Amino acid sequence: MKLEHPDRLMNRTPLSLAALETHDAFAERHIGPDAASQQAMLDTLGFASRAALIDAVIPASIRRAETLPLGPFAQPKSEAEALAALRALADKNQVFRSYIGQGYHDTHTPAVILRNVLENPAWYTAYTPYQPEISQGRLEALLNFQQMVADLTGLAISNASLLDEATAAAEAMTLLQRTGKPASNVFYVADDVLPQTLEVIRTRALPVGIEVKTGPAADAAQANAFGVLLQYPGVNGDVRDYRALTEAIHAAGGHVVVAADLLALTVLTPPGEWGADVAVGNTQRFGVPMGFGGPHAAYLAVRDEFKRQMPGRLVGVTVDAQGKPALRLALQTREQHIRREKATSNVCTAQALLAIMASMYAVYHGPHGLKTIALRVNRIAALFAAGVKQLGFAPINDTFFDTLTIDTGARTAQVHEFAKARRINLRRVSDTQVGVSFDETTTRDDLAALLAVFAQAAGGTAPSVDALDAGLAGVAALPAGLERTSAYLTHHVFNRHHSETEMLRYLRSLSDKDLALDRSMIPLGSCTMKLNATSEMLPVTWPEFGRIHPFAPAEQTVGYREMIDQLEQMLVAATGYAAVSLQPNAGSQGEYAGLLIIHAYHASRGEAHRDVCLIPASAHGTNPASAHMAGMKVVVVACDAQGNVDIADLKAKAEQHANDLAAIMITYPSTHGVFEQNVREICEIVHAHGGQVYVDGANMNAMVGLTAPGQFGGDVSHLNLHKTFCIPHGGGGPGVGPVAVGPHLAKFLPNQRSTGYTREENGIGAVSAAPYGSASILPISWMYIAMMGAKNLTAATETAILNANYIAKRLAPHYPVLYSGPGGLVAHECILDLRPIKETSGISVDDVAKRLMDYGFHAPTMSFPVPGTLMVEPTESESQEELDRFIAAMIAIREEIRAVEEGRADREDNPLRHAPHTAAVVTANEWPHAYSREQAAYPVASLGTNKYWPPVGRADNAYGDRNLFCSCVPMSDYA
């Protein structure tokens, strides 16, 4: 129900409790325009109601007939009720002390980072830093991440994060396939690599014809492989000297990838110093909770020769218009949004927020602090090894950093039983061995409890920790010659922010440089930058979600799995499909999983030869990149003058490839912001020729409650929980990309057999390192749906469409709206055509984007899907007041352009060509421009009370790519 003013309620008699209930209160806070504003916007559009507008926008043939079937979540919960319900689920989880290891470790998140990064909307509501001038803070934090990884691995350059260690290793494999030994299709994986990594590698290798071989690391040089993956230290704890082996692999024409633990590299010789070509790994133990598997920031570092083949985003240093240092995303021509099927990867969303947390962990602790943590962890492992030896157990690895594998023989079951009684998890290596991995959170009491477990199994008395410590003068746990001697983290940023005061101010200085949703709307088309409500974010930091190991026993994760099951059913209801998997940890991975599922379906019918994927010319770049990774051949389908799929061309291509047609990938509403009228026909054409229909769910925010891909012909979709379902973008991740499928595809949803998770016997292999992907952020979407309920989720969709049409209507007299449906209406976004402006004034879409920064706005999506355009998506969360502020800015900019067109302003010396204007430029003694300082900085009156200052002038992209530098900048360069 709508909230009523208390004065009106007081006039009613009797005043009932029901009249005072506020279950819809959250929806009123999530949806920006109130009833009066919505009616005013509808009046502008010429509609009497939201329902009338929606009837005109969405084809009647695909409208949902029923209300969202959300079952127990159909009615909205208040924020307090939803938090209480989720708390009840969280309390069903059991937080044991987990020594399972296998790539995941408990960690302390420094409180200053928890409160001022993870819980700070200035960081978590920002978008990917494609607009560098308003992203300098997070770009610096990501540059710190790159410097940290490069220093610790001993390699030349690192990217700014990948999704998890397993997918990073798979990306390294395909990187070396592109650049390595042309006569070989073999990738060799040492047998002590993390099991989940091997499984993801196998999943990735099969569609692209790579043969994966496994065996002892010592045999790698004889494998005739283009690449070899080594684990350092190994999953069972061994620290091996790979120097001679690496030389032998190189001599045989292969390259070496090393999956390395960054904390271990503070005391071990880094891979780059003994010949590794690529290093990959996870930064989770640098202050990021385990979270039942994620999200965490993986890394990939390479030798200099491979830098232009790297996947993922790369922060580089350039100069701005005034010649001052500025940061930007470098070498973007590698990425899928430009290179499409020829991209180095399909990765779009990465793990920026988690990379920032990990980098700040290194900044806060510094090199000395990190090494102290590492030495302490290693010391605890050494004391444990000495203790279990006294009890008659034999560690099988003489060398170790933090992990020991203990031969427990016939007493193995007892060890696990006694550990469980003390709320301790150990790794189940085999029927005769257990694994124990230590971390920075391990205390003396924890060590004593562990020793007591083994003593109980041995029928003896545990030695005291103090006695062990006093009696162990030193430990030869590392191979001779592998102790690190080189310096790392020598840059000043890692050596000055070690007090909380300094760290707090550093974090504040960075966040102040950036423009995020906490300052203004971010109207990026195809990105859905909507409210990430605080109540949705709160559960992310609960220990009952954060401190759960992804491979913990099932009885300890009951609450997690109930929440996941409920969220899957919520998404089934929203999409109209039969089943959902939450394993894919980004939209790109959901796409990839969906295409693998389609291939598995065809193979199950004896049609594995079907490998042609039809993709409209207007598609997002991840579509062709994912199809290529899935082993499919991309065939482009033309679009007509209105941006719709050209039905005649589709029919011709479907007929031409009928024997080999695997799928079509379409986006709905389409990438040009319109509900195509003939989407059912598109689906029917593809089905008639033996193909499956993949509906990209990037624009699901225009469909929830109104239509559903599973009901109008789709067979499979991915969703973006970081768009439609309120997980924040985090400056470029995390995200979740669930894959949703029809009933005939449900049996092919992904498994992760290496860790004991088998969802479907015929399911595809794992697509992420953990069974449920980025599980710890799933409560965000659960909370959003629970607090909205069926009616309000539909209202949110309707309001998103209303807001977009209001902007399109108001701006149409000033900028042509490139595409529209019947009645001149759009879906949830609109494309403004700036190409005529370029012809008449020389002002480019880039100039307009930079000028918007002076008005306090992030630019809409530039030049997608059409070069020279801006795609605007306001979402339902923005109020009419904020929409009007954006509209006023765009109209004012159009007047500035008109001044150029009419000769009242110079074609070069005008506020657009020199935007954005920094405070330093505006307040300088000299002002060389024909326009005033006031016009530069305060072009509209509202900026007088709320002004955002870009910290740098326009970044020189070409200079940055010509002079690639991706490390922290010396302080002297800022002088």
Swiss-Prot record:
Catalytic activity: N(6)-[(R)-lipoyl]-L-lysyl-[glycine-cleavage complex H protein] + glycine + H(+) = N(6)-[(R)-S(8)-aminomethyldihydrolipoyl]-L-lysyl-[glycine-cleavage complex H protein] + CO2
Record-linked InterPro entries: GcvP, GDC-P_C, GDC-P_N, GDC_P, PyrdxlP-dep_Trfase, PyrdxlP-dep_Trfase_major, PyrdxlP-dep_Trfase_small
Xref: Pfam families: GcvP2_C, GDC-P
GO cellular component: cytosol; glycine cleavage complex
Top-level lineage group: Bacteria
HAMAP family the UniProt entry points to: GcvP
Name this protein carries in UniProt: Glycine dehydrogenase (decarboxylating)
Annotated family: Belongs to the GcvP family.
Biological process annotations from GO: glycine decarboxylation via glycine cleavage system
The keyword Thylakoid belongs to this UniProt entry's keyword annotation: no
